[in-house]
């Protein structure tokens, strides 16, 4: 997880509606007209189908499963991805005194049993290399737990490991279940998570062996890659698979909001954090469409606003507008966006020393929901049909019952204080008396980070302080507007605020 955007064509990112007036000045009210009867398009909730979560053995912790259930409750997510299912910490592979392979799937069973018992399926990242199978003991130094990133010493033994692993899963869970899983080959082989030399051809060798072996076990197993950082290698990867008749069922890659244009696009430009993810998604989307396999689904199996520890980003209310705008822009470009990660039960940089250190998770140390958790809670309430508007601060949807659900935000970069913003929503085509329910996430509502700062940012909060933080994280009861006068409602949004409006 580390990473980099081309301006997305507005014609692909926005449905332009002719009835929306743009603000006329810096402090002018933005008027957005929503046609309640407008033709809508399907709007799958691609941002909440899957989440990332550190490494495999963390799933055995009570705190991990607690946070997983909390996020499952507000999003209904179906898949979880993590590193290290083949690493020594999971105990899958060893050798006897004569060098013969020994397989042990005890931890694998406990890990996957725990996911399935909570209604979550594995998105299996096949990594990292067992020490006894590694060609050289090269480790990924930045990670506290030091995973081995070497190619295997023997390709036949790697194939045998993959074969035994896949067959065990089918024997335990049944092919009807496992055929719904995804198998992704490795993690970010284009950077220092892969020590093959040269990187690309040796990764393709790894992919070829793995994909073919999985399909030998069952053609119903879904396999894909290249799982690269910075949205890299996609066109080359597809070309390689087609030319060499290697199976591939999906494309996976990663990008982060603070990746650089040089790394993602090879250009010398400054791409802002709120544009990077979806410009990268557009790049990959177009590469797949132009390939010999244009129907391959695209999965960004890692993304976030930052790959660094930035409390003012991932712990803050900034994430509400950033997430909403990312969803607006990426709609139609991907099958899934997998947020890295759902929880700060996470140890890539070592054991967590304090809550709110800029971790990636939606839930902070101690089970405290962050503003990003509340943003996902609100975004889950959106409908499954998208109605066109031309505002870049509004996303309008319709539910199956005919109610309208809109999310409205006031974005500013994390390093900028931002200013309040007024948006007037004007509805055409509403029939009968309607009322609005308005949910708010901002500096004063649902913001545990502010409460943490107010108590002096303790390194080791007491249990009482943790309870106070959880209370501060709760979203307040929504405001109810009993009647929409003239079919419109005007919202004042503080800096970095997010509001969700339900019209019934």
Question: Model segments located where?
Answer:
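Substrate-binding cleft/loops of secretory-pathway carbohydrate-active enzymes
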Residues: 227-252, 303-322, 326-331, 346-355
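Bacterial N-terminal signal peptides that target proteins for export
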Residues: 1-8
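Conserved radical SAM core fold
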Residues: 57-58, 86-94, 131, 186-193, ...
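Active-site clefts of carbohydrate-active enzymes
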Residues: 258-269, 285-320, 349-351, 355-363
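Bacterial N-terminal signal peptides
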Residues: 8-18
């Amino acid at each position: 997880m580390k990473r980099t955007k081309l301006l997305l064509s507005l014609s692909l990112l926005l449905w332009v509606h002719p009835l929306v007036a743009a603000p006329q000045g810096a402090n002018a009210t933005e008027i957005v007209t929503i046609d309640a009867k407008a033709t809508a398009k399907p709007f799958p909730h691609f941002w909440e189908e899957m989440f990332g979560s550190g490494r495999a053995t963390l799933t055995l912790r009570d705190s991990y499963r607690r946070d997983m259930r909390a996020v499952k409750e507000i999003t209904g997510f179906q898949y979880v991805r993590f590193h290290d299912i083949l690493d020594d910490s999971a105990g899958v592979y060893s050798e006897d005194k004569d060098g013969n392979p020994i397989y042990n799937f005890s931890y694998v069973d406990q890990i996957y049993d725990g996911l399935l018992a909570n209604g979550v399926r594995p998105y299996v990242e096949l990594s990292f290399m067992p020490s006894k199978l590694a060609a050289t003991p090269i480790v990924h130094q930045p990670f506290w737990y030091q995973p081995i990133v070497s190619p295997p010493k023997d390709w036949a033994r790697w194939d045998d490991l993959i074969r035994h692993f896949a067959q065990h899963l089918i024997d335990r869970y049944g092919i009807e279940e496992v055929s719904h899983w995804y198998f992704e080959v490795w993690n970010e082989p284009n950077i220092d998570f892969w020590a093959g030399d040269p990187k690309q051809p040796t990764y393709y060798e790894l992919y070829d062996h793995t994909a073919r072996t999985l399909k030998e076990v069952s053609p119903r197993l879904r396999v894909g890659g290249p799982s690269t950082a910075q949205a890299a290698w996609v066109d080359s990867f597809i070309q390689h698979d087609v030319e060499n008749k290697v199976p591939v069922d999906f494309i996976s890659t990663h990008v982060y909001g603070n990746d650089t244009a040089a790394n993602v696009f090879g250009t010398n430009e400054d791409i802002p954090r709120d544009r990077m993810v979806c410009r990268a998604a557009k790049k990959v989307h177009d590469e797949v469409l132009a390939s010999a396999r244009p129907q391959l689904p695209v999965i960004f199996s890692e993304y976030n606003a930052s790959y660094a520890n930035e409390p003012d980003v991932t712990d803050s209310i900034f994430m509400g507008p950033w997430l909403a705008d990312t969803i607006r822009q990426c709609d139609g470009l991907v099958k899934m966006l997998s947020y890295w990660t759902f929880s700060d039960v996470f140890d890539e940089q070592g054991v967590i020393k304090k809550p709110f250190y800029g971790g990636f998770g939606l839930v902070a140390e101690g089970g405290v929901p962050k503003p990003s958790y509340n943003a996902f809670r609100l975004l889950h309430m959106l409908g499954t049909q998208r109605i066109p508007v031309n505002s870049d601060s509004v996303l309008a949807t319709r539910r199956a019952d005919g109610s309208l659900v809109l999310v409205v935000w006031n974005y500013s970069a994390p390093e900028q204080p931002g200013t309040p913003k007024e948006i007037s929503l004007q509805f055409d085509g509403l029939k009968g008396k309607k009322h609005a329910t308005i949910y708010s996430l901002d500096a004063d509502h649902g913001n545990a980070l502010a409460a943490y700062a107010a108590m002096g940012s303790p390194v080791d909060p007491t249990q009482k302080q943790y309870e106070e933080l959880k209370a501060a994280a709760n979203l307040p009861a929504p405001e109810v507007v009993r009647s929409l006068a003239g079919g419109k409602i005007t919202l004042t949004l503080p800096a970095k605020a997010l509001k969700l409006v339900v019209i019934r």
